[in-house]
Amino acid sequence: MVERKVKVAIPCGIHIRPAGIISHTANGFKADSRIIFGYHVINTASILNLVASGIHCGDIVSVECEGPDEQAALEGITSVLEDSTIQQ
């Protein structure tokens, strides 16, 4: 398992568009991945769970990935979370 703390740079936080991008990215890997925000564990494959998470720009989250391509999954998901160009 690999883990990284990330500061979310998506300007409007995780709403439907970035949630879809995160989910699509996560589903492109065999590794299981999740985002830890406070006491919440969010499955990155679930758009609804991501939207409901209440994660805003500037929040610090942990991304955890476990599986055969865990490092690539971690890089992919964190790059989306750190992308400040994703708009509404």
Label each residue range with its predicted role.
Residues 7-53, 57:
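Compact, glycine-rich, soluble single-domain proteins
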Residues 1-5, 60-62:
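Intrinsic-disorder/low-complexity, polar/charged segments enriched in Ser/Thr/Lys/Arg/Asp/Glu/Gln
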